[in-house]
Amino acid sequence: MKKFLNKIKSNKGNSLAEFAVTAAMMATLATTAAPRFSGVGEVGKQNQTMANLEKLGKMANQYYMDTSSPPTPNNPSGEGQGRIPGQERYDTQIGGYNRLTDVEAILNEQFNKWDDGEGGQWKSVFGLESANSSYVGEYQFTDESTDYGQGSGAYEWRLGLSAAEGPIKSPYQQGHYIYIVIPGGQQEIENPSTGESQLVECNECGPILVLADAYNPSKFYTVKSFN
């Protein structure tokens, strides 16, 4: 549990105490995003993909900060309320999960291969056109949108890249970066009597971003909270 919760990072500097309720609900989750591999080459790939996921998280944070500010000549992308690339608004869901506990089993060894059917609940970060064409036919995840402009995931993610950089690629041939967004505007709480979780309205609660490498999402993932 602690290993998973350590991956939930607030992009506003808030304490992880805010996630105490979530911690209780996810007490059965005991996975780690840093498996031990034999061989220097595999360790290098592991470290590289985790570094890439962290970079993607920072890109999302910068985008959230830019959109949260009012529009100005120096910040034309300002909207007055932050959102994650691909969201129409901060309370828009991306992918197939409406609450963080829905992801619990998925990140507990269930979704562990790029062609798993669970991938249908996820979206490509930079678009499938940037994926390894040898494996595109095996992927179950799809593009968030193929349009351009506000709310188009791949387009908005690419805004954080330099012209020379290009989409960030997984070091694994079968890998590809995917994501889901738990919508803001709500809070998941636990009923102390039943142990069941429920969603309540919370206007000040931001979205939660989960990024993963499709090579093995149960091992390579990161969680970012925008509360």
Range-by-range predicted roles:
Residues 1-12:
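N-terminal leader/signal peptides at the extreme start of proteins
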Residues 14-23:
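N-terminal signal-anchor/signal peptide hydrophobic helix marking the start
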Residues 24-25, 52:
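Residues within membrane-spanning alpha-helices of integral membrane proteins
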Residues 26-44, 64:
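C-terminal juxtamembrane segment of a hydrophobic transmembrane alpha-helix
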Residues 42-53:
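Membrane-proximal amphipathic alpha-helices
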Residues 58-90:
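Alpha-helix exit/C-cap motif
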Residues 87-103:
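Extracytoplasmic/periplasmic/luminal assembly and interaction segments
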Residues 101-227:
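Intrinsically disordered, low-complexity regions enriched in Pro/Ser/Thr/Gly and acidic residues
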